[in-house]
Design a protein with these regions (language model features):
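Helix-boundary and loop/linker segments of multi-pass membrane transporters
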Residues: 40-47, 103-109
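Hydrophobic alpha-helical transmembrane segments of multi-pass membrane transport proteins
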Residues: 5-6, 31-32, 52-67, 93-142, ...
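Hydrophobic transmembrane alpha-helices of multi-pass small-molecule transport proteins
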Residues: 6, 15-37, 148, 157, ...
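Polytopic endomembrane small-metabolite transporters, centered on the Drug/Metabolite Transporter
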Residues: 22, 37-41, 84, 119, ...
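Hydrophobic residues within alpha-helical transmembrane segments
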Residues: 20-25, 52, 56, 83-90, ...
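Hydrophobic/aromatic residues within transmembrane alpha-helices
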Residues: 9-11, 15, 71, 80, ...
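Cytoplasmic-side transmembrane-helix entry/capping segments in multi-pass membrane proteins
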Residues: 15-27, 75-84, 139
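Juxtamembrane helix-loop-helix junctions in multi-pass membrane proteins
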Residues: 63-88
Length: 190
């Protein structure tokens, strides 16, 4: 939703009625899965400081994704990713130095190295590379809707790994998300 808003605000991409309907359907599907189709859960939400940070992260990601489509400089996807990683390391360096000054040390062992390798390779590098590539091919608006697939994949992983039961609300939410994605991929821009 926020990616479409910032694309509209910055005049980066035009949207269409199908995309708006698709976002509504898929967002409703996400809410169905997260709340287990229980309106009481939605009505009794309590917020804390961490939720505010998540809102900041959501806005940052939406602005990044919208502006990614607009980038006019001549960098390959790999070079652009390297630039983002370098900037991130520069911003994180002061926090790392403070931790060292306070006496915190990493306990490096094989499970730590394996976990760190996984996090660096897949969520850290591959996901960003494919996100940049996807936006360059189909645009920010159409790419953003695919973020709504996360609850579907989380459900599937919970079923496979933790033996969670597949419930009716999982099916309804997944169908709404899929309908939303299909809708958002149709139609001409207005």
């Amino acid at each position: 939703v926020m990616i479409i808003f910032f694309c509209w605000l910055f005049k980066i991409e035009k949207t269409n009625v199908y995309q708006i309907l698709g976002v509504i359907f898929s967002l409703f599907g996400v809410v169905v899965i997260i709340t287990k189709a229980d309106l009481g859960i939605l009505l009794n939400l309590n917020f804390n400081k961490g939720d505010l940070w998540m809102v900041v992260a959501m806005f940052s990601w939406a602005i990044y994704s919208a502006l990614l489509r607009k980038k006019k400089f001549d960098l390959s996807h790999i070079s652009f990713l390297q630039t983002i990683i370098t900037a991130g390391l520069i911003f994180l360096l002061p926090a790392y130095l403070i931790e060292i000054a306070l006496g915190y040390r990493l306990n490096i062992h094989i499970p730590f190295i394996l976990t760190l390798s996984y996090v660096v390779l897949f969520p850290g590098l591959a996901s960003f590379f494919f996100w940049i590539k996807g936006i360059s091919i189909i645009g920010s608006n159409r790419s953003g809707i695919f973020l709504h697939m996360m609850p579907i994949f989380s459900t599937l992983m919970a079923i496979l790994i933790f033996k969670e039961k597949f419930m009716t609300y999982h099916f309804i939410g997944a169908m709404l998300i899929i309908v939303g994605i299909v809708l958002s991929s149709k139609g001409r821009r207005v």
